[in-house]
């Protein structure tokens, strides 16, 4: 199973791609998509869309896990992240990829088992899960790998994060139908 994790943003989008087979995590690729603050919002979103679309076409993941929006003190920031998420989700839909979202709290719990884990603790667990000699850099790519691992781990556990729209109902490639988590797990076994 191949999963891409995405840490969305307008200036920096982190991505991480992991193959998971027989309880083994294998890194395929990770990195960031960067846009210049000197560009218009529309130009930045076009770059995010185009680059994520290229990554999806190159690596052909079966699933996309993307960080959900959370509380931002700055309304301008939340709007720009929401716009970036929108073009990333569009790229996923157009590439026929099943998608789901995780909040930062869900990722912390999914990686460390502790909702108040520090960024460094999460990065160390990503390093451990993936058997790396050092923590992946930059931070946005490490965050994307954490989102990816959270999704992989959620498929094999009965853990509920308390948000039915994330794990109990997952958008399937058609984009219009919803299936239960049990049906989703059965699809993975085929």
From Swiss-Prot:
The yes or no answer to whether the keyword Nucleotidyltransferase is present is no
Q: Which reaction does it catalyse?
A: Endonucleolytic cleavage at a junction such as a reciprocal single-stranded crossover between two homologous DNA duplexes (Holliday junction)
Q: How is the cofactor bound?
A: Binds 2 Mg(2+) ion per subunit.
GO molecular function terms noted in the UniProt entry: crossover junction DNA endonuclease activity; DNA binding; magnesium ion binding
Its keywords, alphabetically, are: Cytoplasm, DNA damage, DNA recombination, DNA repair, DNA-binding, Endonuclease, Hydrolase, Magnesium, Metal-binding, Nuclease
State the family it belongs to.
Belongs to the RuvC family.
This chain belongs to which protein, by name? Crossover junction endodeoxyribonuclease RuvC
- Gene name as annotated: ruvC
């Amino acid at each position: 199973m191949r999963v891409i994790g995405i840490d969305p943003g307008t200036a920096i989008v982190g991505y991480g791609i992991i193959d998971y087979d027989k309880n083994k995590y294998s890194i395929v690729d990770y990195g960031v998509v960067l846009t210049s603050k000197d560009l218009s919002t529309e130009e930045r979103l076009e770059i995010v869309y185009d680059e994520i679309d290229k990554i999806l076409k190159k690596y052909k993941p079966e699933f996309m896990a993307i960080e959900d929006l959370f509380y931002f003190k700055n309304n301008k920031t939340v709007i720009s992240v929401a716009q970036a998420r929108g073009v990333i989700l569009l790229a996923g839909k157009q590439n026929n990829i099943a998608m789901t979202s995780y909040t930062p709290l869900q990722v912390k719990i999914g990686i460390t088992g502790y909702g108040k884990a520090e960024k460094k603790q999460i990065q160390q667990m990503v390093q451990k899960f993936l058997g790396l000699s050092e923590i992946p850099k930059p931070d946005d790519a490490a965050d994307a790998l954490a989102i990816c691992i959270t999704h992989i781990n959620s498929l094999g556990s009965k853990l509920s994060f308390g948000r039915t729209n994330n794990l109990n109902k997952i958008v399937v490639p058609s984009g219009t139908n919803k299936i239960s988590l049990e049906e989703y797990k059965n699809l993975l076994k085929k």
